[in-house]
């Protein structure tokens, strides 16, 4: 199962992208398969999570951001029984 990251680049007063780059380096070095989606506006995390979890199959979604990002992603998950959230 491929990890799916929903990243808020503006979190931590703009440091979200820097934090993502550190995480991405570890993922690449470890050979872990992943997809990344960046939020572009308020509410976008919900839309992204909904789109991802409407697709068939199991999902492993990681929300990278603050409380607001996690809240948006949780609220967008459509099929909770097929989704692992981190």
Where are the model-predicted features located?
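Small-residue-rich beta-alpha loop regions that form the catalytic core of phosphotransfer
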Residues: 2-86
């Amino acid at each position: 199962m491929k990890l799916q990251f929903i990243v808020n680049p503006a979190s931590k007063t703009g440091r979200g992208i820097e934090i993502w780059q550190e995480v991405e380096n570890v993922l690449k070095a470890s050979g872990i398969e992943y997809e990344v989606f960046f939020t572009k506006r308020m509410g976008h995390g919900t839309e992204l999570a909904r789109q991802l979890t409407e697709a068939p199959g199991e999902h492993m979604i990681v929300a990278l951001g603050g409380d607001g990002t996690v809240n948006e992603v949780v609220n967008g998950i459509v099929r909770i029984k097929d989704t692992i959230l981190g």
